[in-house]
Amino acid sequence: MTSELALFGGTPVRTEPFPDGPRFRERDLERIREVLESGSLGGIPFPNRTHRAFAEQFCGRLGARHGVLVANGTVSLSVALRALGVHAGDEVITTGYTWMGTAASIVHINAVPVLVDIDPNTWCIDPAAVEAAITPRTRAIVPVHLANQIADLDALLEIARKHDLVVLEDCAHAHFAEWRGRCVGTHGDAGSFSFESSKIMTSGEGGFLVSGDETTHHRAMSLVNCGRKEEGYDSFEGRMLGWNNRATELQAAFLIGQVEQHDELHAQRKSNVELLTKGLTEIGGFTPVGDDDPRVTRRQYYEVLYRFDPEQWAGVHRDRVLEALLAEGVEFEGITFYPPLHRDSLFTVSAEDWPMIRDRYGDRMGPEDFHLPVSERAAYDESVWVHHSLLTGPATDVDQILEAVAKVRRNVDALR
């Protein structure tokens, strides 16, 4: 039985890579050529022609009033926080189970990140934990819509109103996902999106900031464009020290066609997710995270989250099962995707470099500063992340995924 598993020398179920990356049609390539031949590749004049076209298209699809394309998603978060009036020393509450860029964007503006635990059902930020963490220094809440889940916006917005806080939605995973029929990113005071290379929409790198308030938008435009305060975005008082965080015309050109193709690809992913979930449920040990919350009116499938149950796999740990699946040609991720943020080696914050944290954390932020048991359990034991590249191809791809899972399940004793 041992030899059947590819991990021990058997033949893998799949040897071909899954399809990945954007699909460029001839019209998309023409648009890119037009930019290359225009002689105007960068962000000046700001916003440049293709940037304007994409911003109008993306905001129109989201139902957002204002938006600006920027260099990347972390930049989008930092710019949004400053544009919303978060200052040095202000506390910003966010989730302990996210990519480090969410919290790093807070540190980068000399504000103080406060990490709280996640809801055990959705693995998004727990509203009760948010409210418990509020202090007189709290200025903002940054919920993350994680994978195919959406944070409880009703509860979070109610808390924000009660305590006079701003809400910045981190929608890096959630392009065009909907809460109560409205796209995420448009419920809070601002929303941030990512177009990094792994995302369902990508320009290699890139980010987008949306807001419903003109002054917030004008401040963001100025911050992105080196602090310039030019006609069209000069309604706010004073000046702000900005950076060059402009996106290029090529980034905008890459993205326009992906908005046009989104619904077709989304339908394919949705169908494949349904097939995968049905098959994994039949095999056992992989339960979809979350529930059928009627307030979630459209999910996105950048990643799909499952909860692993070792009791249905003869007590074998998730990581060992995922190792065997990888050998079969199917990459599901666990701790390699997101460790809990307070234990992430990439998120190293000391008062020597970022003095505003000293009052709350002393010389450095460390694991001892946080109690995040749900985040730790999800990261180290339960979470299984399935990337959209496994879900955008034909249904036969899902058949092979399920074949691999079933094969590993048949041979689970060999993994003990």
Curated annotation (Swiss-Prot):
GO MF annotations, alphabetized: pyridoxal phosphate binding; transaminase activity
Protein EC: 2.6.1.101
InterPro entries xrefs: DegT/StrS_aminotransferase, PyrdxlP-dep_Trfase, PyrdxlP-dep_Trfase_major, PyrdxlP-dep_Trfase_small
Cofactors named for this entry: pyridoxal 5'-phosphate
Pfam family, one: DegT_DnrJ_EryC1
Known catalytic reactions: 3-amino-2,3-dideoxy-scyllo-inosose + L-glutamine = 2-deoxystreptamine + 2-oxoglutaramate
Keywords tagged on the record: Aminotransferase, Antibiotic biosynthesis, Pyridoxal phosphate, Transferase
Protein origin, superkingdom: Bacteria
GO biological process terms held by the UniProt record: antibiotic biosynthetic process; polysaccharide biosynthetic process
Residues annotated with N6-(pyridoxal phosphate)lysine modification: K199
Pathway annotation: Metabolic intermediate biosynthesis; 2-deoxystreptamine biosynthesis; 2-deoxystreptamine from D-glucose 6-phosphate: step 4/4; Antibiotic biosynthesis; tobramycin biosynthesis
Family indicated by similarity: Belongs to the DegT/DnrJ/EryC1 family. L-glutamine:2-deoxy-scyllo-inosose/scyllo-inosose aminotransferase subfamily.
Reported function: Catalyzes the transamination of 3-amino-2,3-dideoxy-scyllo-inosose (amino-DOI) into 2-deoxystreptamine (DOS).
Protein name: Putative L-glutamine:3-amino-2,3-dideoxy-scyllo-inosose aminotransferase
Organism: Streptoalloteichus tenebrarius (strain ATCC 17920 / DSM 40477 / JCM 4838 / CBS 697.72 / NBRC 16177 / NCIMB 11028 / NRRL B-12390 / A12253. 1 / ISP 5477) (Streptomyces tenebrarius)
